[in-house]
Amino acid sequence: MNILVLNCGSSSVKFRLIHTYFDLIRENKDYSIASGLIERVGSEGLLSFRSTNAQGEVLSTLRTTAPVRTHQAAIDQIIKWITSENSGIQGIQSLEDIHAVGHRVVHGGEKLTRSVLIDDSVVEQIEDCIELAPLHNPQNLKGIYAAKKTFGPNIPQVAVFDTAFHHTLPDHAYLYALPYQIYRRHRIRRYGFHGLSHRYVRFRYRTILGMERENVNIISLHLGNGCSACAIKNGNSIDTSMGMTPLEGLVMGTRAGDVDPAILTYLAHKEGHSLDDLDKLLNSQSGLLGISGLTNDMRELIEESLENDDRRAKLALEIFAYRIKKYVGAYLSAMNGADAIIFTGGIGENADFIRQKICAGMNWCGIEIDENLNKQTTRGREGRISPDGNKPEVWVIPTNEELVIARDTYRCVMRKE
């Protein structure tokens, strides 16, 4: 089965075309046929595509610009290239050769707690969650609307939710200490995000060690421009750092993470900030960017810190690592210990300097990393970076959210659910 995976943002569309079926899933041999990104949707789009064979060898690449005014136009560009001879993809000549479409949807609320075939009722429920994820769900829906128009009713579409992995959180972990009737009226609670990434890490870790899902006890750290920690006990998410929105928790590229909420009322009175001003402050002007005053790019901050001895760059890195360290310690307590700490995401997979900083001084609970293994495990490499015999182990596992979406899409289509 050839499955097109779509991840639609406000001004971008990411895609991956994955070939899979039951035996391939069972043996972990499903593979990517093509992948790419269209940036600057809404204007002159920048297209970056490539195709690969089952061995991962690149067959063809395309990097060009084209008018891409809408998400519909972006998906049309993707289909045009995939089905063209120039793509080098064997066996994909028309829409009929794409058997299903899987969509990443950020927020499923309390009702959409598993991946589902998309029908009118599911679309309505995703629309109902827009107020919970106003920056993300509308863009995800644009992809669904566009794919429905392109493929018609005969090609099944599946919604795979970032929040679904965290539906196992107990109520004492997901409820805020606000009047309970506020939760009843508005469903204000912790939902958690990065679920596809944390779920892949759980799958990959247990596959490497040959263990059953219910025996997995890990802390997963997804560190990128957005960051979250997840406590996974007996195979289930029991706590996670992001909350009702992706703003809560760890320090991120431009997001503040945990903040005393009284600061907002103070700023509103003191500086006359509106609600929109405060939202922009917390989501777009804070985090690594806000502290450093330079950038939200971790690579640049590390360079400024090490080569130019920039004080605020150093401070940003210290605050970033310290916040993560606090969450790891809290989750170790909540879980009564863990078997492994796992780094994933762009920063988690590549920034050995940050991994070292996070783990430094945690030998009191057994967390140590091997300096050589840590430096070697970057650029897509997977492996344990802690010394032999140490518990908890420390691992780096590159995430693969698209594979999770493709496999769920396959299962939903085959089970017709």
From Swiss-Prot:
Any one biological process term the GO annotation gives: acetate metabolic process
InterPro entries: Ac/propionate_kinase (IPR004372), Aliphatic_acid_kin_short-chain (IPR000890), Aliphatic_acid_kinase_CS (IPR023865), ATPase_NBD (IPR043129)
Residues bound to Mg(2+): 7, 401
Active site, per annotation: 162
Keyword Acyltransferase: no
One matching Pfam family: Acetate_kinase
Pathway(s) served: Metabolic intermediate biosynthesis; acetyl-CoA biosynthesis; acetyl-CoA from acetate: step 1/2
Subcellular location as annotated: Cytoplasm
Residue positions binding substrate: 104
Annotated site location: Transition state stabilizer: 194, 255
Cofactor note: Mg(2+). Can also accept Mn(2+).
Function (record text): Catalyzes the formation of acetyl phosphate from acetate and ATP. Can also catalyze the reverse reaction.
Family: Belongs to the acetokinase family.
Subunit description: Homodimer.
The protein's name: Acetate kinase
Organism of this sequence: Chloroherpeton thalassium (strain ATCC 35110 / GB-78)
